[in-house]
Regions:
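Short glycine/threonine-rich catalytic loop with a Thr-x-Gly-x-Asp
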Residues: 259-277
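Ribokinase/PfkB-type carbohydrate-kinase core domain
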Residues: 1-18, 25, 29-254, 258-262, ...
């Protein structure tokens, strides 16, 4: 449940650049377009790649071309979009991503640079009637769910799916169902979530507590402990190449990342981690097991350049075997 974005990639061949007659600026020549489900859609892509059989999507899109493409992308992943509300008064949130690609034979369609992004977002508050429909959808879907993922992507307060009212409704559902995992990820408001597991990165944790404390693992652990407070659910703080800190109420634990070689692209790594945490917790795993598996998946997705990566169960098992052999 949350903010579903369309990731619209425009791959441009720099060898075909032309000067614009009207402005004299560079007219980039698009040689390929790609449409993917982003933000909460990236979570869906990861859940699908890891073999989840029933994925309900709760959010809204506009009655526009971007909404059509986003819904098609989600359907292509096998997700149920019957609770993805089409609203005439909203636009479909979209990240337009022009990229330079190298099309030489040795590097066919390899992304070499991502240019300035173009954002389409709703900057007016989400109407009350739409919030009511979103809350009703959450109530309908909950009974059949093994876990709930909440993605609060929109920075502008109360302009996305996870408004204050919707967040409080989710918290009430989580309070009523303490045995069902709820995992929340928020770009700007992670400190406002109660009753659910949270997964900030270090910068988000610092912002939530209005502090610029150090970047050490110990400092991150202290931040997470303060954020968890009286929450009864496990909480996580991601540390990029240093892995993740976990607070499950029995003490802080640092779960190290798995090292990778070669170029990496962190786009979507946080969403993949959120997906895995929900899967493992929903299957009855411990918080530490969830963090370890999330780090394992992240070591795969960050090696997928110029796209929001995913990992299959086979890839995860293979990576685990590689790591196990290396450490034996």
């Amino acid at each position: 449940m949350g903010d579903f974005f369309l990731d619209a990639y425009f791959d441009c061949d720099p060898h075909l650049n032309e000067p614009s007659v009207e402005t004299g600026k560079t007219a980039y020549q698009v040689v390929r377009t790609r449409r993917q489900a982003g933000a909460a859609g990236t979570v869906v892509a990861n859940l699908a790649a890891l073999g989840c059989h029933q994925i309900d999507t709760i959010g809204y899109i506009g009655n526009d071309g971007e909404g059509f493409e986003l819904k098609r992308a989600l359907t292509g992943l096998g997700a149920d979009t019957s609770h993805l509300i089409v609203d005439e008064g909203r636009v479909t949130p979209t990240y337009g991503k022009p990229c330079l690609v190298e099309t030489a034979k040795t590097r066919a369609w390899q992304v070499t640079e991502e240019l300035e992004r173009l954002d389409i977002k709703n900057r007016r508050p989400t109407p009350a009637r739409l919030q009511t429909r979103l809350i009703d959808a959450a109530h309908r879907c909950l009974s059949a769910a093994d876990a709930v993922v909440v993605v609060d992507q929109v920075s502008e307060p109360n302009c996305g799916v996870i408004t204050t009212r919707v967040r409080r409704s989710i918290e009430e559902l989580a309070k009523r169902h303490p045995d069902k995992p709820f995992v929340a990820d928020s770009r700007k408001r992670i400190g406002q979530f109660r009753q659910v597991s949270i997964k900030p990165n270090l910068g988000e944790a610092q912002a939530a507590l209005s502090t610029s404390s150090g970047r050490s693992v110990a400092a991150a652990g202290d931040l997470l402990k303060r954020l968890r407070g009286r929450r009864l659910r496990p909480c996580f703080c991601t540390l990029s190449t240093r892995g993740m800190v976990v607070d499950d109420g029995s003490g802080l634990k640092h779960v190290a990342a798995f090292s990778v070689s070669g170029p990496t692209d962190p786009v979507g790594a946080g969403d993949s981690a959120t997906s895995v945490l929900a899967i493992v917790l929903g299957a009855g795993g411990t918080a530490t097991e969830a963090a370890l598996t999330a780090n394992l998946v992240a070591s795969i997705t960050v090696q997928q350049i110029g796209t929001t990566g995913t990992a299959t169960r086979r890839q995860v098992l293979q990576r685990y075997q590689e790591v196990d052999a290396r450490e034996s």
